């Protein structure tokens, strides 16, 4: 046995890019993408991606370079998930909801060489590049045109997306990874403009999470997948590559619209879709909501869906699955594996069970909850709190240019520390209770409390500020800012609160702006003078939901 070693035949680098060429062979005439009046087959998609990769290479993009994309869920965004890494480059999909200031920071931090930008977001990118310091060469921009969108531009482009596709070589030999540990994707997670956190994943981890997600969700061949989840969120939880593996049809939509979703689900017999709990709420509350002709599998993550929302969506024919994941693990790595006997329970009992994040998926080796002081496993009693830790093949390589933060997250004991607080129930199912890291999840978007607080503190009238999550039945959570101001609370407190909200709107993306501002004489502190956020969270929780009418 000792003589049997790895060799070139059995140690070829794993990469999900091979799914595309297989799809072209096995599912060549099957529809791969539908977007308005545009439709492609898997054979056409493979050809287009090869041509695009060829043209990208001709622009001087080489192995290890970063290519960024700012676009919604359109065919170009999907194709770039293959075409960019086919050149050996690293794909960086940027959240379209960010402002120009933050995008400029990410482009500089990642040393992006080339940016594909949808024409709707062109003004945003132009503004972002003007913020580059003198002497810093901004990246080359490639315009993604769309006949469905009207927008004017005075920018003179040397390259457009479709021109690159047409000019490329369909027989291009794509650049295979030299090692399966070669970087493939870069995704920025919560962080500040001064310290962005860029999560880098290898071809290996993306291969593993993709196969893992398909198996865990029991995705069969030829699914019809509706893109309600932004592809810039952890690359659409890996289903961008997963649909090629199973010959699925990608139904693309530029912007989430409830009426359009209902129409597309019926028109194309959609079988699968993903999204934050807020999407479930919007679908089930829509006046256009009607009983589905066929069941639709819906995978959601983040805050668990409220019982009322779960009941409404299930009554329409959606089969809701709940999971837990993080950018550092490339997607959903814990899921609430459903047991048949649970179907006989009441709606409230089912919702209580489904609120639990669940058990590890097969692509993760171990998930545990450990005491934050001793590092020992906590009791399996559903009560003892600890930090959620995990290990497995889909864990990130690390944070770009930040070895210190990487070592704080991936520690010498071999575990990735998530910063999330949870419990393990007696049946082994995990339930997230809180977060060590101060992050609010609002409508599926991560809101870093520290960054919001830094903006609130910029207001000359603010003395103290603390931002916490206020539970919301529609958005899951919304930012709630507690502040003390110079001169103390005055009779016109409503005006003070409105002024702070407006102040933040001018300096933050809309989803990060506090929806609630509470002016206090003084924020509660402990004996060391630290603001007691635990007390503030309780106050925010007692306020109830802003969206009470949405339920």
Residue ranges and their predicted role:
Residues 8-12, 17, 29-74, 78-82, ...:
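Conserved AMP-binding/adenylate-forming core of the ANL superfamily
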Residues 162, 245, 270-275, 284-352, ...:
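Gly/Ser/Thr-rich phosphate-binding loop
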Residues 207-224, 232-272, 282, 286-287:
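Conserved AMP-binding/adenylation subdomain of ANL enzymes
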Residues 360-389, 408-409, 426-427, 490-497, ...:
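Conserved beta-loop-beta connector loops within the AMP-binding
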